[in-house]
Each structure stands twice: as C-alpha cells, then as structure tokens.
From Swiss-Prot:
Function: Responsible for the transport of dicarboxylates such as succinate, fumarate, and malate from the periplasm across the inner membrane. This transport system plays an important role in the energy supply of rhizobium-legume symbionts.
Keyword Transmembrane belongs to the record: yes
GO molecular function terms noted in the UniProt entry: fumarate transmembrane transporter activity; malate:proton symporter activity; succinate transmembrane transporter activity
Keywords: Cell inner membrane, Cell membrane, Membrane, Symport, Transmembrane, Transmembrane helix, Transport
Protein name: C4-dicarboxylate transport protein
Coiled-coil region: none
PROSITE patterns (UniProt xref): NA_DICARBOXYL_SYMP_1 (PS00713), NA_DICARBOXYL_SYMP_2 (PS00714)
Membrane-protein topology: Multi-pass membrane protein
GO cellular component, one term: plasma membrane
Transmembrane segments: 20-37, 52-74, 87-109, 151-173, 194-216, 226-248, 340-362, 366-385
Length: 461
C-alpha cells in the first residue's frame, strides 16, 4: 500500500529541467556570446531562424484542428457569431486604448524633443521598401487576402487568417450536417492530441533557438548602438509595462484573475518570445495553456488566432509613440486634430499587419503615409533601433491576447473556474493578496475573485 502511494507521488522536477529556466539561460548565454564574440554571434542567426520555421510549420494545423473541432462541437451555431462579436468588441476597445496610451505618454515624456532633425537631410531610400509595401496594404486588399486562392495554398503559405477562415467555414459545415459529421469530428479530435504532443517536442528546441537569435542580435547591432535613441526605447518599454500592469491589470481584476499570476503562468511563452522576437513562436503553446486553464476550445480557437491580427496592443503603442517621436525629432508641430487623425488612421492600418514580415514597421509606414503632418522620411531615424523594440511589442501582444481569451471566455460563461483553481493555483494566491492590499489601501471590502465588472454575471463553476 505504502509502496503504491510512493509510486503514485510525482517526483519533483529539478529546476534546470524547466523550459523557462533553459530558455532564460540560453538568452543570457546568447547575449554574452554576441557581446564578446560578435562575429561568432552574428553567424548563429540560422539557429533562431530554424526554430521559428519549426514552430511556424505546426501553427496552421494546430489552428485548423482547434477551431474546427471547437466550432463543430457547438450545439448552437449562433454562439460562434456571439463569441466572434464579443472578441471584436474587446479587440477594438483595447487596441484603441493602447493607441491612446502611446499618444499620452509621448506627449508627457517627449522622447524626441531637442533633436532638431531637418527632414530634408534624411535618406528616404532607407524606408522606401517599407513605404511601398505599406501603400500596397489597403483595407480592401487586406480583406481580399483573407480568402485563399486554394485550401492547400493557405496551409502551404502558413497564412493565419486564411487558415482561420477555412477552419471556421469547415467547422460550421460539420455542425450543419449533424450526426453525419461526427466521424469527422472524432477523427480531428484524435489528431489534436498528437499535434499538441508534437508542439511540446518542438518546444524542447526553444533554448537553442533563443540562444542563436540573441547571439545574432547582440553580435550584429551591439549594445552601444542603443545609446543615441535609448530614450525612445526606454519610453516604449515603460509604456508597454504600464499598459500591461494598469490597463490590462484592471480588466483582469474585473474578470476574477491576476495579470501578475497570468504572466507567471505563461512565463515559458514570454521567454520564448523574448528570445525569438516572434509572438507567433508562442501561439501553439498559448492556445494549449488557455485550454488547460479552463477556457473552452471553441473560444480559444476563435479568439487567439484572430487576436494575432486584430489585438496587437504592443504594436499599437509602438505606432503612436514612434509617430510622435518622429514629429518631435523633426520639430513638426501636431495639433490636437492632427493627433486625433493619427489615432483614427492607426486604428484602421493596425488591422492589416497580419502575415507581413516586419509588421510593426510596415504598419507605421502605412499610418504615416496617410497622415500628411508627419514626414515619412523620419522613419529613417528609428529604422536602426526598431529591432530592439520588437521584443516588447511581441510580449505585450502575447499577454494582451492571453487576457482577451480569458475575458471573452468569462463573458460567455465558458471559463471553468474549478479547473482554473486546480490548474492555476498561483492565480488564487495573487488574487487573495491583491484583495488584502485593496482593503488596506481603500478601507472597505475588496471584490472577490468572482467579481465581473462587465456584467457577464457570476463566474461559472
């Protein structure tokens, strides 16, 4: 009996076996190699590229299986539209808030003031390729690109929105044929588990990819290259941190979970993004963790992939902050009307950045091209440091989409609180701590973890 109990007791995993420890160690090692042996570091770029390609290889099938089985399993097809509508509402509100926060911080800290750059002295050729690409990305062309030429082509290109489009239509079609579609659902369900197992296997190569990517970045660009524009970089990182902790922290609290606990829960994915500068690298792992923590697969399958195109909080902060930096650096005065126009244009242009290499910089070019007040040539000022801000953009986007998934699941009553308690005990500890601090600071009873500020009703058991 005792022997059986001992056999059932799981052994404690050594700290060095945890993926986040391995990735963090690899990042530090990559920085050191790139700093002390820059030529060697620059030559290690293929390691990071290879890992991103490995992960990109499985993104399309993971999305297809998750979305299709999730929608096909819905008894009420109206729920698909309801979930999608709530997700788009959330994306619109918080993407706009991210743009507004970027504007506010740029006006207060003024990171570009005092540079007195003459736009005529800048080389417009340095950003010509980005501007050309941006001009080709209109709202109509973006919507047309969602529809693939062929089903196979969408998977071959790895276009997230096209795969999502096919998955939604196929899932609805399976649900419409009723019982005759159940063999297909069972087959796809059987494929889902080994696909997520493959994801876990590929994640074991994350430390190698992070090491190569960080060694290349530090070896090629160097730390000294940050000095002249460190104010902009620091302002962007600070703004992203404040947005996550204050704005997203508030909406998390209103929906019964802690943003700090969430960050701890997805730390492996955050470190992976930090090492590779690609939020897509963490997409399969994020989808798996959101489902494990209690979100229904149907919600996860709709919200996470869609959020990667429509809920880019980090990119939105970057766009307005960088736009005002360029205006301040070139002594270009912007009235309140100009800044409102910038905000409105950015709201539209930010929705067309999915599937584009260098999406943040290209989207910035698209925004400035439509706002005559800010010189597009001024983008040459930040071209060299854009790479150093990509990590913060990607991490903020990742956290924003994780919170969006939990919030929409809570609004729909599709968040299993019992499962969350078991799978995510850290959330209970942080929430209780926050409630105690709230009582001490405010002098009245703090909301419990079941509080819902958005009228979605009590949390589901």
């Amino acid at each position: 009996m005792i022997a059986n109990q001992a056999a059932e007791t799981p052994r404690k995993v050594p700290f060095y076996r945890h993926l986040y420890v391995q990735v963090l160690t690899a990042i530090v090692a990559g920085i050191m190699v790139g700093n002390f042996y820059p030529d060697l570091g620059a030559s290690l770029k293929p390691l990071g590229d290879a890992f991103i390609k490995l992960v990109s290889m499985i993104i399309a099938p993971v999305i297809f299986l998750t979305v299709t089985t999730g929608i096909a399993g819905m008894a009420d097809l109206k729920k698909v539209g309801r979930v999608a509508g709530k997700a788009i509402l959330y994306f619109t509100v918080f993407s706009t808030l991210a743009l507004a926060v970027g504007l506010l911080v740029a006006n207060i800290l003024r990171p570009g003031a005092g540079m007195h750059i003459n736009p005529a002295t800048l080389d417009p050729k340095a950003v010509a390729a980005y501007a050309t690409n941006a001009h080709g990305t209109t709202a109509v062309s973006f919507l047309m690109k969602i529809i693939p030429n062929t089903i196979v082509g969408a998977f071959a290109d790895g276009n997230i929105l096209q795969v999502l489009f096919i998955s939604i239509l196929f899932g609805i079609s399976i649900a419409m044929v009723g019982d005759r579609g159940q063999p297909v659902v069972r087959f796809l369900d059987a494929l889902t588990e080994p696909m997520f197992k493959l994801t876990a296997v590929l994640m074991k190569a994350a430390p190698i990819g992070a090491f190569g990517a960080m060694a290349f970045t530090n070896g090629k660009y160097g730390i000294a290259s940050l000095i002249n524009l460190v104010m902009l970089i620091g302002t962007f990182y600070l703004t992203s941190l404040l947005f996550v902790l204050v704005v997203l922290g508030a909406v998390a609290r209103c929906n019964g979970f802690s943003v700090i606990a969430l960050i701890a829960y997805i730390k492996e994915e955050i470190l992976l993004v930090l090492g590779t500068s690609s939020s897509e690298a963490a997409l399969p792992g994020l989808m798996a963790k959101m489902e494990q923590v209690g979100c229904k697969r149907s919600v996860v399958g709709l919200v996470v992939p869609t959020g990667y195109s429509f809920n880019l909080d980090g990119t939105n902060i970057y766009m307005t902050l960088a736009s005002l930096f360029i205006a301040q650096a070139t002594d270009t005065p912007l009235t309140l009307a100009d800044q409102i126009l910038l905000l409105l244009v950015a709201m539209l242009s930010s929705k067309g950045s999915a599937g584009i290499t260098g999406a943040g910089f290209i989207t910035l070019a698209a925004t400035l091209s439509a706002v005559p007040s800010v010189p597009v040539a001024g983008m040459a000022l930040i071209l060299g440091i854009d790479r150093f801000m990509s990590e913060s953009r990607a991490i903020t986007n990742l956290i924003g989409n994780a919170i969006a998934t939990l919030v929409v699941a809570n609004w729909e009553g599709d968040l299993d609180r019992g499962r969350m308690t078991v799978r995510w005990p850290g959330n209970q500890r942080w929430t209780k701590f926050n409630n105690k601090m709230f009582k001490l600071e405010r002098g009245f009873r703090a909301p419990t973890v079941d509080v819902d500020c958005f009228g979605a009703g009590p949390a589901q058991p």
